[in-house]
Amino acid sequence: MSDCYVNNTIFEIKAPEGKTTDCIERNLRKAVNHQSPNIVLDSFRMKNIHNKSIPSFLIERLSRRHGIQRIIFVNLKREAIDINSLLR
């Protein structure tokens, strides 16, 4: 079951706990395979990962697609960044 609707689109909210990008990869896989291809990734609980490195990692994952349609990244400053708009 997905977490929320944004502009009539179902999104799954993920807030992974971890110290590497592996935790992000795992959560993206879970969301796409079992919940929704539209993902909101909140970095609030991630420690020791720089906020600047996460968007580049997400851009790489989105460019490969693998079932992901849209990613919105919420950084530690609580700013929402649409990763799809950075891909273009």
Language-model features and meaning:
Residues 4-17:
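Conserved catalytic cores of phosphodiester-cleaving nucleases, focusing on short active-site segments
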Residues 16-88:
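Metal-dependent nuclease catalytic core centered on acidic motifs
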